[in-house]
């Protein structure tokens, strides 16, 4: 083989290596995300067996629970790019990683305290929002048992970020799937009063989730203390020692991530409320379409987490070519997958819908027709959603979170929601108008994020964005 042939193959081999590394990191994260979704689905199914009132109370409580939980989750996610950059830099990486993880756990404790206070008063908050007293009371009981899941969940996220940055995410997958099984068992025991325990009803579901989250954290803590590759970092050594500059760095990086998640969650909550203003069939069809889209979104979400690590490693090493290669690899994989899923939605909508509703029941005809029409636009929605999710992870690996937060506000609340309202209620597009608005908002966010990535990738070395 000539020197020219060898030189031509070297870049090709680097791209192949990046594809393999990205997929090896992403697929356990995708399955981990699906496992966490399965835990929520288990809770819903178990609550449904206690009756519609219990299910409604659980839904109210869960919505109130997830609002502050998501904000805190954004803060915890800041540990991933910081750890990856420190690993890529290599110098003092053991000490730096230990300090970052420690400050991440400190932050988990501090942010949990106000969340506990809010959730403890869940019933009063729901009553102030005008909810039915009986439902608010049951939701309040549920929240007082559920709130203790917050801290161990955050601790689990910090430790998961650590093992993912070391490119060993398989442990998180194992732990989550054990937790899914335990969560189902705990629900069965405490909700319905089995194995000699009293029947706690909806409170039992909250207890089950708290115990499962504690199990997840305990399992992850055991892994990082006992597994050979992780043990040398001594993550819990000198846990009491502060590092305020690093703590403040986590806040600076994490607050915009929390803002992005808040904008995303609230825009989808608003879309559901708007569908409810149209009619019940539109809301039901929307719930089906969004659930289908949410399942496939687990893939770009896993790629978002993987590309943050891959870009962060190259970023810390001062390797601009590696930054570019890592970002584009994940972006192409993510968008290609979502385009394929969009095609499935367009070609076989009834097959997908049949998993959620009886197609043979004439009473469901209008819901089915609406869901089919929504899935046409959900196909476009998929591509834009995948693009923005992966692009956000690419920029996060460069510690770039403030401007993406502004882009999220512009796309979701400046374009998506107003356009959806205008099309749905002024121009008579109804539910389809809301889906067009959502798709347009995601397209704007994706375009802005990609433009920023292109500019950063071209004009500056990676370390310019690390501090």
UniProtKB/Swiss-Prot annotation:
**GO CC terms of this entry:** plasma membrane
Question: Which family is this protein grouped under?
Answer: Belongs to the multi antimicrobial extrusion (MATE) (TC 2.A.66.1) family.
Per UniProt, the keywords (alphabetical) are: Antiport, Cell inner membrane, Cell membrane, Ion transport, Membrane, Transmembrane, Transmembrane helix, Transport
The keyword Membrane belongs to this UniProt entry's keyword annotation: yes
Q: What does this protein do?
A: Multidrug efflux pump.
- Pfam families, per the entry: MatE (PF01554)
Answer whether the UniProt record assigns the keyword Ion transport to this protein: yes
Tell me the domain of life: Bacteria
Q: Where in the cell is it found?
A: Cell inner membrane
Q: Name one GO molecular function term.
A: antiporter activity
Bilayer-spanning residue ranges: 23-42, 62-84, 104-126, 141-163, 170-192, 202-224, 250-272, 287-309, 330-352, 367-384, 405-427, 432-454
Q: Give the range the annotation lists for the signal sequence.
A: none
* NCBIfam families, A to Z: matE
Task: Give the GO terms filed under biological process for this record.
Answer: monoatomic ion transport
Name the major location: membrane
Identify this protein by name: Probable multidrug resistance protein NorM
Topology in the lipid bilayer is annotated as:
Multi-pass membrane protein
Q: Identify the PANTHER family for this entry.
A: FMN_FAD EXPORTER YEEO-RELATED, MULTIDRUG RESISTANCE PROTEIN NORM-RELATED
